[in-house]
From Swiss-Prot, chain A:
Membrane topology: Multi-pass membrane protein
Keyword Mitochondrion: yes
Gene name as annotated: rcf1
Name of the protein in its database record: Respiratory supercomplex factor 1, mitochondrial
Native source species: Neurospora crassa (strain ATCC 24698 / 74-OR23-1A / CBS 708.71 / DSM 1257 / FGSC 987)
UniProt GO cellular component terms: mitochondrial membrane; mitochondrion
Family that this chain belongs to: Belongs to the RCF1 family.
Lineage top rank: taxon: Eukaryota
Record domain HIG1: where: 20-111
Subcellular location(s) per record: Mitochondrion membrane
Gene3D superfamilies xref list: 6.10.140.1320
Record region (Disordered): 1-29, 144-221
GO annotation terms (biological process): mitochondrial respirasome assembly
From Swiss-Prot, chain B:
Listed Pfam families: COX3
Subunit record text: Component of the cytochrome c oxidase (complex IV, CIV), a multisubunit enzyme composed of 11 subunits. The complex is composed of a catalytic core of 3 subunits Cox1, Cox2 and Cox3, encoded in the mitochondrial DNA, and 8 supernumerary subunits Cox4, Cox5a/Cox5, Cox6, Cox7, Cox8, Cox7a/Cox9, Cox6b/Cox12 and Cox6a/Cox13, which are encoded in the nuclear genome.
Gene responsible for this protein: cox-3
Alphabetical UniProt keywords: Membrane, Mitochondrion, Mitochondrion inner membrane, Translocase, Transmembrane, Transmembrane helix
Membrane-spanning intervals of the chain: 23-41, 49-73, 81-114, 138-161, 165-188, 202-230, 249-265
UniProt GO MF annotations: cytochrome-c oxidase activity; ubiquinone binding
The protein's name in its UniProt record: Cytochrome c oxidase subunit 3
């Protein structure tokens, strides 16, 4: 909600060129206002509404007091005043919303823009994460392939071993290699990014726990 | 003058009512209504049948009690000026208790709306809630209710000037506008994108507007009874406590709508 009309004149022409567009960047009170401040800001923005409300209630109590006295003419006058005061309040409200329409529309667009920005940022982060994972996976495959080739060369150089025992020994060594390699051997490309197991541990949170991620991003709003 | 004869004349302005079963009857019905209502809200088997019985009992007791009051006031002439003042006091106590009831509802609303918790996204209306646009159907409803205030004021004016037709037509117009208002509220409820179970917003919205709707229905019945009493020549240009009470109640309901419209529909969306 815009604070007052003075924001209308100083609106920047290119909203998207600003890092985080908001009319209230220099107005910390807007983000931190408490309940009482919120109410008083509303009342200051549209002072005719509370005035109309007070007049309406006053006319209503006046009608009751006249009724207690048995003064039907005064009751009638107060009823008319009540309807008039309420009509005034409603008209003031409609006029106020019309007066602030541009301000409020702008504010709504700013909110939307910021929300979009947050979403885009989150998407980019996720894409980066996937790319890192992909690179890690490729590196792993490459190393395995290299090892397999090296072993095949070694074996061919030493002369193919024959017999069932030798084949079993080879298969065992192969399996052992596969088991031990992923965790320890692969050096991460980026020190900030975790290795494969780390990513897998986080995976459920990334996919299922989007709530927490949403909450934290929205808190900043 | 013997005591027996004197007992037929009340040489004081007050109305000492004859023994009546309705206060006790109503008390029993009210206790049953709250007990069975609370139990049925906690899913006790078949208790809602007792709830409906208690409700029917309460409505019948009210009907018969009000019938007695009408016969005492209109046909027995017991409602002297002092009694009328007492009835007026009863009306204002009723309206004050209603006002405090709505104060509690507004308190609940402002408690949630002014400092929205982090679960709501720290904003009001909460994240994911699409509130009703206040300048569509609610504005029309506001105008309808305000017009009904004007028509009932016209009916009152006509009555105190002794114009029977104006009083009748004004009341009929008011009741029609009230029914249209209630119908539009029903439309708004049926097309709203949220329900009463949608967090603090849905709860406060339907809690406040729903109870206001119930009060509109009660006020409509109040004015319909008054309309029938005008039609049946019960009310005169200077003795119409029931009608004036009904009008005051109607204005009260309208004022509550103004506050609802400003805080829940306009500032709260």
């Amino acid at each position: 909600m815009p604070n007052s009309t003075d924001n209308q004149g100083s609106a920047p022409p290119g909203l998207s060129s600003r890092p985080l567009p908001s009319s209230f960047d220099d107005n910390a009170d807007f983000y931190n206002e408490n309940g009482f401040q919120k109410v008083s800001r509303r009342l200051r923005e549209e002072p005719l509404i509370p005035i109309g409300c007070i007049a309406t209630v006053a006319a209503f109590t006046g009608a009751y007091r006249a009724m207690r006295r048995g003064d039907h003419e005064q009751v009638q006058r107060m009823f008319r005043a009540r309807v008039a005061a309420q009509a005034f309040t409603v008209v003031a409200m409609v006029a106020g919303s019309w007066y602030y329409a541009a301000d409020r529309q702008k504010q709504k667009e700013l909110w939307k823009l910021k929300e979009q920005q947050d979403a885009e940022e989150k998407r980019q982060k996720w894409i980066r994460e996937l790319e890192v994972r992909d690179a890690e996976d490729k590196a792993l495959q490459e190393r395995l392939e290299k090892r397999r080739k090296k072993k095949a060369e070694r074996d061919s150089a030493a002369g193919a071993p024959d017999g069932v025992a030798a084949q079993a020994q080879a298969a065992y060594a192969d399996a052992k290699e596969k088991v031990s390699s992923p965790a320890g051997d692969v050096a991460p490309e980026d020190p900030n990014k975790s290795n494969i197991t780390g990513v897998r541990e986080r995976l459920p949170t990334w996919l299922g726990g989007s709530k927490g991620a949403d909450g934290s991003s929205r808190d900043k709003n | 003058m013997t005591n027996l004869i004197r007992s037929n004349f009340q040489d004081h302005p007050f109305h000492l009512v004859s023994p009546s079963p309705w206060p006790l009857n109503t008390s029993v019905c009210l206790l049953n209504l709250t007990t069975t209502g609370a139990l049925s809200m906690h899913n006790f088997n078949n208790i809602h049948y007792l709830y409906y019985i208690a409700l029917i009992g309460l409505v019948s007791a009210m009907f018969l009690w009000f019938r007695d009051i009408i016969s005492e006031g209109t046909f027995l002439g017991d409602h002297t000026l002092a009694v009328q003042r007492g009835l007026n006091l009863g009306i204002i106590l009723f309206i004050v208790s209603e006002a405090l009831f709505f104060l509690a509802i507004f308190w609940a609303f402002f408690h949630s709306a002014l400092t929205p918790t982090v679960e709501l996204g720290a904003q009001w209306p909460p994240i994911g809630i699409e509130p009703v646009n206040p300048f569509e159907l609610p504005l029309l409803n506001t105008v309808i209710l305000l017009s009904s205030g004007a028509t009932i004021t016209y009916a009152h004016h006509a009555l105190i000037k002794g114009e029977r037709e104006g009083a009748l037509y004004g009341s009929i117009a008011t009741i029609l506008l009230a029914i249209i208002f209630t119908g539009f509220q029903g439309v708004e409820y049926s097309v709203s994108s949220f329900t009463i179970s949608d967090g603090a917003f849905g709860t406060c919205f339907f809690f406040s507007t729903g109870f206001h709707g119930i009060h509109v229905i009660i006020g409509t019945i109040f004015l319909a009874v008054a309309l029938w009493r005008i039609f049946a020549y019960h009310l005169t240009d200077n003795h119409h406590v029931g009608f004036e009470g009904g009008i005051l109640y109607w204005h009260f309901v309208d004022v509550v709508w103004l506050f609802l419209y400003i805080s829940v529909y306009y500032w709260g969306s």
